[in-house]
Amino acid sequence: MSNKRLIHGFHAINARLWQNPKSLIEIWLAGGRHDARAKAVLDKAGAENVKLHIVDKERLDSMSGNARHQGVVAMIDASMNYVDLDDVLENLSEPPLLLILDGVTDPHNLGACLRVADAMGAHAVIAPKDRSATLNATVSKVACGAAEVVPYITVTNLARTLRDLKDAGVWIAGTTMEADTDLYHFDASGPLAWVMGAEGEGMRRLTREHCDVLVSIPMFGTVESLNVSVSSGMVLSESRRQRVLKAG
């Protein structure tokens, strides 16, 4: 299977150029653009010896499937994204803060989760290989550059990964509406992996059984549920808030 894939949009491509330029194979930029963002891509691509083509909008529309490409598309070597979970854990300077997505298959949701994970300083996003969205151009665009900097680790056996994390001293907190413990009465300041289930289905039974604790997000309005990326942002933000308070 080819490791090449397309990404589009200035956020995603600039993140690649600055964070992982060797993963860029070539870039296509809309002709006639002389704005600062286009110039920044031109200059950085030249500095990193990344092949760049000036093409018309129709070519970019065709390449991106008429997505909102903002006038720039790139081909990347996705194999250079590979990150091992053990490497992530071994190189941290603070207790792990992880986001685990169990059955999130929508690329827009994955992109939004990566974006909030980056904003809240999560060290990695983990998902099972067989029931998850894959990194693609849509994910990269929605993530606004976060897909290029937050490790997205897919695992063959999520239950085994949860056991390995426990052995490494990481507490596993699953989120569910039925939990007795709520987010604002839970100590989320230590080494922690938040587990989010698929919208409408929640966590799978085996995943739930591997959680150390189940936590609910208090709801004070009329809506009964939240988008998975919104929920992810809330729990990660609470972990960060508690860590700041604990540090004094």
From Swiss-Prot:
Keywords: Cytoplasm, Methyltransferase, rRNA processing, S-adenosyl-L-methionine, Transferase. It catalyses: guanosine(2251) in 23S rRNA + S-adenosyl-L-methionine = 2'-O-methylguanosine(2251) in 23S rRNA + S-adenosyl-L-homocysteine + H(+). S-adenosyl-L-methionine binds at G197, I217, L226. InterPro entries: 23S_rRNA_MeTrfase_RlmB, Alpha/beta_knot_MTases, Ribosomal_eL30-like_sf, rRNA_MeTrfase_TrmH, SpoU_MeTrfase, SpoU_subst-bd, tRNA_m1G_MTases_N. Disulfide bonds: none annotated. GO terms for cellular component: cytosol. It is found in: Cytoplasm. Its EC number is 2.1.1.185. SMART domains: SpoU_sub_bind (SM00967). It is an enzyme of class 2 (transferase). GO terms for molecular function: RNA binding; rRNA (guanosine-2'-O-)-methyltransferase activity. Pfam families: SpoU_methylase, SpoU_sub_bind. Belongs to the class IV-like SAM-binding methyltransferase superfamily. RNA methyltransferase TrmH family. RlmB subfamily. Specifically methylates the ribose of guanosine 2251 in 23S rRNA. This is 23S rRNA (guanosine-2'-O-)-methyltransferase RlmB. It comes from Chromobacterium violaceum (strain ATCC 12472 / DSM 30191 / JCM 1249 / CCUG 213 / NBRC 12614 / NCIMB 9131 / NCTC 9757 / MK).
